[in-house]
Amino acid sequence: MKWCRLSIILMSLILLAGCMPLRQPSPSADPQQTWQERQFALQEIEDWNLSGRLAINAIKEAWTGTLRWTQRGDEFKILWLFPLGQGSVELYGNPDRVTLRAPKEEPMIATSAEELLGTRLGWSLPVSGLRYWLLGLPAPGLPVVKSSLDSFGRLLRLSQGGWQIRYLDYKWIENFALPGKIFLEHPKLRLRLVIDHWQLG
């Protein structure tokens, strides 16, 4: 009977522990050192998926919709779904060849996503840089004009490639703090992205 009662108590404690929220890390004593370690860890993430809500404001137009992004190494697939019958745009490819598809239109092919988006939509996104910005990293190969960190060693602000990026929220995904809300601003374009779901691997 004693062993039975002890087993019940132990099982109850295990179940309670499983229901408790994950402990958030404490602020870093050295955010810059934590940031260096964080960059090395994030750079190892090659395969991921995200979905979220996107708002785009250009000079004369504005759109809202859903964004789904899949990254597999250098291969990517981006799907924009716009509400109220505004349609969808699918963009996929790699650093050498990119294809854009829209309903009832012939596929468009080019060597860069920026070229295709500028031709089809009238505005362009730095897709090659966004791949890294979405993870909370600077894009390699572009000088960082300015950046700032929070007390946990995560990016708060980043100025790179003519874009101003602000990270307003992070969420814990498989032991990584990944962005949950990002604002991106360019002289001719503003984006607001709320990421609802992350999946790594």
UniProtKB/Swiss-Prot annotation:
Lipid-bearing positions (S-diacylglycerol cysteine): 19
Signal peptide residues on this chain, from the entry's feature table: 1-18
GO cellular component: cell outer membrane
Keyword Transport in record: yes
Domain of life assignment: Bacteria
Record's bilayer topology term: Lipid-anchor
Keywords: Cell outer membrane, Chaperone, Lipoprotein, Membrane, Palmitate, Protein transport, Signal, Transport
Residues with lipid group (N-palmitoyl cysteine): 19
InterPro entries in alphabetical order: LolA/LolB/LppX, OM_lipoprot_LolB
BP-aspect Gene Ontology terms: lipoprotein localization to outer membrane; protein transport
Compartments (UniProt record): Cell outer membrane
Subunit structure: Monomer.
Record function comment: Plays a critical role in the incorporation of lipoproteins in the outer membrane after they are released by the LolA protein.
Similarity field: Belongs to the LolB family.
NCBIfam families hit by this protein: lolB
Protein name: Outer-membrane lipoprotein LolB
Species: Nitrosococcus oceani (strain ATCC 19707 / BCRC 17464 / JCM 30415 / NCIMB 11848 / C-107)
Lineage: Bacteria, Pseudomonadati, Pseudomonadota, Gammaproteobacteria, Chromatiales
